Amino acid sequence: MASSAELTYRNENDGMVQGFRLSVAIPVHNEESVLPELLRRLGNVLTSLGDGKHEMIFVDDGSIDRSLEILEVASKSDPRIVVLALSRNFGHQAAISAALDQAKGDAVVVMDGDLQDLPEEIPRFVEKHLQGFDVVYAKRIRRKEPWLLRLCYYLFYRAMSKLSDIRLPLDSGDFALMSRTVLEHLNSMPEHHRYLRGMRSWVGFSQVGVDVERGARHSGKSKYSLKRLLALAFDGLFAFSIVPIRAAAIIGASAISISLLYLLYALYAKLILRESPQGFTALVVVITFFSGILLFFLGVIGEYVGRIYEETKRRPQYIVRRKINCAETNEDRPKMS
């Protein structure tokens, strides 16, 4: 059930949401071909929600095309459009963080800027929020992407669900609505390597999924290369699981056990059977195999140590070089990580 404060947002006469301010956070990187359609559709959706106090926060993540120019022109005719231009390409998650730091609404929706997250789904999120949910996330029931990529996503989410220390919803990305309370907790987290969909789950509060169909890109190509997808997967794994470290200990203990068993067999063959164990080649293979395992898990440990090192430097997650339609306040300054 919605709280009394939330019930004041409803207007029974026209179905619009009154006294409620929604922020929409959108990272943008080289999306000049998509932005005009996105601005039109998102603007219409926010207008349908009423009041006119909503805001669209676009974060230009170091685009080299006309994305920033298009946003600047649009902001002159629509005061709801807020633009942050980062000093360089800091990455998708950092750009979202910049928008979340800027958001002033009672709730915030995070969505991608390629129209794969459909703006028309936002009213459904708002309706669930008004029913009392702090987090409303999109659960993707269909994806219009190559089958191999869909398979990788499918396997990744299920592997993360098994390996993570917290419950991560299956097939849910960054497309979600979060209450002001959840937003403030997220903004207080200083992580440099951010996996926002995992952080959103870690915060807790009342959460619910909404089935949505993930659309195809309106135009252009995905800005998420294989390298960036793998980096995001590693951020999720190493930020929310210590299973790799535990696996190193388990495999190490297993290797020691196998070695001891082989030693006992060798002693038995030598002292009881009066046989000399053969197999120099097999011994070399075994040594090489376990040396490879050792080096692999040394790399895993190094990954954790490297991330700790990144956190200790406390560099900003992002740097804003320009702001449009937003005033500078202490709250707007980038968080140190």
Language model: regions and residue ranges:
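Hydrophobic helical membrane-anchoring modules
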Residues: 2-19, 195-337
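Short conserved micro-motifs on helix faces and helix-strand junctions that flank
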Residues: 27, 86-88, 176, 249, ...
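Generic structural signal for secondary-structure transition and capping sites
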Residues: 44-47, 108, 134, 164, ...
